[in-house]
Regions:
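A feature for the membrane-embedded catalytic helix bundles of lipid/isoprenoid biosynthetic enzymes
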Residues: 1-9, 79-186
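Active-site flanking loop/helix segments enriched in acidic
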Residues: 15-20
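Short, flexible coil/turn micro-motifs enriched in small/turn-prone residues
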Residues: 21, 55, 68, 124, ...
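Membrane-embedded alpha-helical segments that form the functional core of polytopic membrane enzymes
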Residues: 23-72, 102-113, 155-165
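Membrane-interface alpha-helices at helix entry/exit sites of multi-pass transporters
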Residues: 73-78
């Protein structure tokens, strides 16, 4: 029996779309949400991001069904995820800077740095042959936290949570690699 995700993937493939099309469509939608955020339309942006969330899973299902999974597709998906997340946080930073809300701007930068470092520490760890999946706040969790904050009109709380927990996650990954490297050295 096909899952709803597989049915959607099959339908989109029949329309002539590819997994990469869906990945880029998702990014375009996220950039649109970032613009909404920049102008203070948090609820609409949260709704748009929520509606776009399934596309992040559909592109992979499409690639598997079409039997065209590729390293480039996985790479493109990861890169567009980073662009999308940074665009959303950038929209908030812009909005708060226009409001003169320095605390929001600073938290936005710390959250953005943490988010990038969560991804970077995992990629670098895995590139060196270590496991880099540990931590309390992966991309999916960060997205959920941000969506909730946008939907309730209080993204500052979400960004504060992301700023703290994303950086803790990056540190957890650093310490995990340190432990793994000590085990490797023996």
């Amino acid at each position: 029996m096909k899952t709803p995700l597989e049915a959607i993937a099959r339908f989109l493939l029949k329309l002539g779309l590819t997994a990469d099309h869906i990945t880029l469509f998702g990014l375009a939608g996220q950039l649109g949400a970032a613009v909404l955020i920049a102008f203070g339309h948090f609820g609409w942006a949260g709704l748009l991001v929520l509606l776009l969330a399934p596309f992040d899973a559909v592109d992979g299902a499409m690639a598997r069904q079409a039997r065209v999974t590729s390293k480039f597709g996985a790479f493109l998906d990861s890169v567009t995820d980073r662009y999308a997340e940074l665009a959303l946080l950038g929209g908030l930073i812009y909005y708060w800077s226009q409001q003169g809300y320095t605390v929001g701007v600073m938290l936005g930068f710390v959250a953005a740095a943490g988010s990038v470092l969560v991804s970077y520490t995992r990629a670098r760890a895995e590139g060196l042959g270590f496991s880099g999946k540990v931590g309390i706040l992966s991309r999916v969790e960060r997205a959920i936290v941000l969506i909730v904050g946008l939907l309730i009109g209080k993204p500052i709380y979400s960004v504060g949570i992301i700023a703290v927990l994303a950086n803790i996650t990056a540190l957890q990954r650093i310490f995990s690699v340190l432990q793994q490297s000590k085990t490797d050295a023996r």
